[in-house]
UniProtKB/Swiss-Prot annotation:
The dna-1 (dnaBI) and dnaB-19 (dnaBII) mutants show different characteristics for replication and membrane binding of plasmid pUB110. DnaBI is essential for both chromosome and pUB110 replication, whereas dnaBII is necessary only for chromosome replication. GO terms for cellular component: cytoplasm; primosome complex. The lineage of its organism: Bacteria, Bacillati, Bacillota, Bacilli, Bacillales. The gene is dnaB. Changing D122E: In dnaB27; impairs chromosome replication initiation, the effect is reversible. This is Replicative helicase loading/DNA remodeling protein DnaB. Coiled coil: none annotated.
Amino acid sequence: MADYWKDVLPVDPYVVKSRSMLQDIDRQIITQLYQPLIGPVAFSLYMTLWGELEQNRLWGGESTHRQLMGMTQSNLKTIHQEQGKLEGIGLLKVYMKESERQERLFIYELLPPLRPNEFFEDGMLNVFLYNRVGKTKYQQLKQFFTHPAISEDAKDITRPFNHAFESLQPSEWKLTSDMEETVRLAEGSEYTSVGQSPSYTITEDVFDFDLFLAGLSETMIPRKAMTQQVRDTIKKLSYLYGIDPLQMQNVVMSAIDERDVITTEALRKAASDWYQIERNGQLPDLVEKTQPVHLREGEQPAEEDSLDGKLIALLEAISPKKLLQDIADGTEPSKADLKIIEEIMFEQKLEPGVTNVLIYYVMLKTDMKLSKNYIQKIASHWARKKVKTVREAMKLAIEENRQYLEWAEGKTKSSKRNQKVIREEKLPDWMTEKETASDSESGQQKLHPQDLEEQKKKMMEEMQKLKKYSAY
């Protein structure tokens, strides 16, 4: 169902529904806490959908995607891309209802944001926000959503229900058969709710619970302590901090209390302490993640003898931040470059190894500079292609090199037909042989031999830098 948008037509209808009554506090939370994470376009899409509910409470009227395209001034691909951010962060659910006549109706259910206390104690979103807006703005936002608590020395003297209504007669509590039918909720209906905040989801393949539990006896961690909330928190913390199942055993054991209870707050603190000990106090960051083990090629001796194999192993083993540092002779990457990479990793959900191939390719094409628009365009293209491994990314870069060149040069196909273009480009050596063969077959102009040798020399120099500064 992830590719349903490819078949969506502008005339296809949709309706907007809200999980609960959205209020002004929800608007403030989304504007100030979520917008820095999802970006202005996704934020605008949420507000546009919300606007259809203003006069209709929890359900809006039927509209078409053409009308939505007109309201947002976006095409269906862009709407789908921004919609994905809302889905991933827990602000939107999408349903498709198909009739017997093959007519489809899309239902967009708006979900309220996390409450401020839930957001700032989440362990993932709050860290992501901190890295997006910086320490000063983060503190300002946190201050905005906090207020003084009731003093601890104040005594609660609230009267209970049974004291306030002690004079009620037994007849007033009697439930008759006629009343039972009246109070029962009709099938297919749900009560109006306010402020329910379902959390975003992390897929099950992020963490191996079987391996985690295999090393823990019932005495050490009672299974009753492993509630669904605890499991969800473990998945989030594993993804955020890069904690594997065996390491997580120690984290959980340090979080359980004397009553055999594990709280989410204790888990977050234990995971944070573990991470800061491992990383000398540094906060987690998407750009410091490496390619997941299940998406690596593993040991392949035959491939290791080739440059392709060595490069794949390298790009799988290091983080995007480390790659940028290695390319710059060990110099710390600029905050601007890191922000660009972090944005594409989060928004396009690219794996770290795939991101490395993208960095490697783009920097060679743009004289060792990260062009934001160029890298974002290729990243969104790879995300739609569902590229997950380093080899897949390299293969796609080879196959679609000319298309990327057109994007970089800003030229249309019509202009390319009207003039002869001599391309003087930087080609990674893992692309050179295949690109040359392709050029020969298609009759298109190739790189001059002198330029090609110069670029191969530069590429080998860059590879030596990577080998010097990277251990894999």
